[in-house]
Amino acid sequence: MQGVIEVRPENLETLSSGGLDLSYIEYGQVQPAIKLLYAGEEYWYFKTLPLKGYGAVLAGYIRDLQARGHKPILARFFNRIYIYATGITPIGAGKPPGAG
């Protein structure tokens, strides 16, 4: 994963899954980012799902994030759906050196 990608509002689409309409960005063959910036907010990487079959579990992850007060946004990189959300602890943050 690379660093940060700034989301341009004109690139946002809507993805409907599991009764939810979700903000979605199609990046195609670009390396995924650890963080997306959109409308002044930081959306940190949360989880990735395979393109085939994501519909079976996506809504559950999104509803859980929303119930905990996080705003999700989805992005497609290569053949995977990446879930990003506001207010989550970034991967590897808060761990002491050498912990894994």
Language model segments and positions:
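Acidic/polar low-complexity segments and flexible, solvent-exposed patches
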Residues: 1-100
